[in-house]
Regions:
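N-terminal interaction/assembly modules
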Residues: 1-95, 99-102, 107-120
Length: 120
């Protein structure tokens, strides 16, 4: 039986795919939120790097980094509840990442929320 996929989840999947592709080809993003993420990439990557000091940005798996970039952008925009953003990011990590990706993504986002005192 096929499950209905939430349109917001589909948009997040598309954004992660665009960010991932951009990490290889620097192609232009077609989605407005993805373009905004790319414009704010240095700020977003600094937050990720600070939350994962043992993992320099250039050593983080590119799909995990793409998922984290999307989630951090969403956390900073505060349009969705923190729990929803983290849950969605973990689901994307299960879909696209390695076996260790969900735990890594969850840990990094949890630390960012804690350090930036983002409202839960």
């Amino acid at each position: 039986m096929k499950k209905h996929i939430d349109p917001r989840h589909k948009r997040r999947q598309a954004a992660v795919k665009q960010l991932f592709a951009h990490s290889f080809t620097k192609q232009k993003a077609t989605d407005a939120s993805t373009r905004t993420i790319l414009k704010k990439q240095s700020t977003i990557n600094k937050l990720i790097g600070d939350a994962a000091p043992l993992w320099p940005i250039n050593q983080i798996n590119r799909i995990d980094l793409s998922i984290l970039q999307l989630a951090v952008y969403e956390l900073l925009s505060e349009k969705e509840p923190v729990k929803v953003i983290i849950d969605e990011a973990v689901e994307l990590a299960k879909e696209f990442g390695s076996e260790a990706s969900p735990a890594f993504v969850n840990g990094v986002l949890g630390k960012i929320v804690e350090e930036k005192e983002i409202k839960k």
